[in-house]
Amino acid sequence: MMDLPPDLEHRLLTARDASAGVSTDTRADLAGKMFFALKGDNFDGNAFVQHALDSGATHAVTTDVQWHGHPSVTVVPEELGALQQLARAYRRRWTCPVLGLTGSNGKTTTKELIRDVLATEWDVHATAGNFNNHIGVPLTLLNAPKAPGFVVVEMGANHQKEIALLADIAEPTHGYITNIGLAHLEGFGGEEGVYRGKKELFDHLATHGGTAFVQESDEKVVRASADVQERVDVPTSEWRWHAEAGTEHQAHIQRPDGQTFPMHLEGSYNLPNVVAAVVIGDHFGVPWNRAQHALSAYVPSNHRSQAVDTGNNWVLLDAYNANPSSMTFAVNDFAARKHASPWAILGDMAELGDASADAHERLAHLALDAGLELWTVGTWFGRAKAKDNRPSWRHFDAYDALVTALTDVSPSGRQILVKGSRSAGLERLLPYL
């Protein structure tokens, strides 16, 4: 990350203080905001500086030297580095706790659970959606109030050293890793690469005297926390998840003392992150009754662990993303429910590199051996299907062919798990189910 000259950093901080936030998108409402002209593969924000100012932006940041001397424009040597450096400088003014959160699965859902629990006692600013990369994290920080009460920063990565960069920008005082599994294997360079990449969050805490919330149910997370002096255990083994399909609340969570509370959230694989929200809330003074109320009120969205009654079928929609770990969690949990007519509609998993063929074969066999009627779509599942002719498995090379088959069958009275990578877009199947 680049270091801005002090006078340039001061100018940018002054511009941020005079604005209502920061944006990189001229399609958004820019009134009162600061605009960063980023350059990407398919766009160049430098071409929209005038448009941003005309749209009400208070200030613009660009690399285009023709704007030198304009009172509402700052010219920088490199726009992304300037965005990241400004975000770190802005964050360094705060005295509040900053919680960094990463993991192979469940980051966004966990962030929302933690946010909602903390918000019962704190003025919380948290990552919007999944703005969790080298651009999203700086924007998360820069769109926080000048003096927030608590900040929760989601951090995503598909290569080593990316979490380290995000931690350098956000400088978390606390951290939580949901789990360390088989995600983005291609970019991370295999399973060990995933471990090293996720561990970077705890490495930052170890170096800077931070506190790690340690998920005891994941051996790799426990190992990754070894160098952190201040650790708080997240004791998931003492809690229980009871599923109740067809009810308003899809699950009941049993506390160690035997008391239960309802949740709308689907999937027992979410239990560790529910417990994390409780433990983190308790650490920061959230009374149990407020934490419980926040968790019971939480309703998942954006195709993550959502139970949907279509009128014809009961659908567990978990189609936001997929990797071998999350797929295995979902299939095992769904099969354990002992549904009367269980289907699984699964789409290809992306970014697995050399592990792709084996991962799809294993996942298909897991679903079939569990007694699920399996429908799959995508190239990798197609290769796996060529080696397995079980009649309970139907495969389609393309999404349109899958839709045609569903239209012909018109399933009714089924319980259906729908899961695949973001690129598969399987949430589009709901009208046909």
List where the protein language model places each region.
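Phosphate-binding loop of NTP-binding sites
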Residues: 82-212, 216, 220-228, 432
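Short amphipathic alpha-helix with an adjacent loop that forms part of the alpha/beta core around
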Residues: 168, 401-410
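Acidic, Mg2+-coordinating active-site environments of NTP-dependent enzymes
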Residues: 62-63, 67-70, 176-314, 339-340, ...
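Generic hydrophobic/aromatic pocket-lining and core-packing "Φ" positions
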Residues: 49, 163, 198, 202, ...
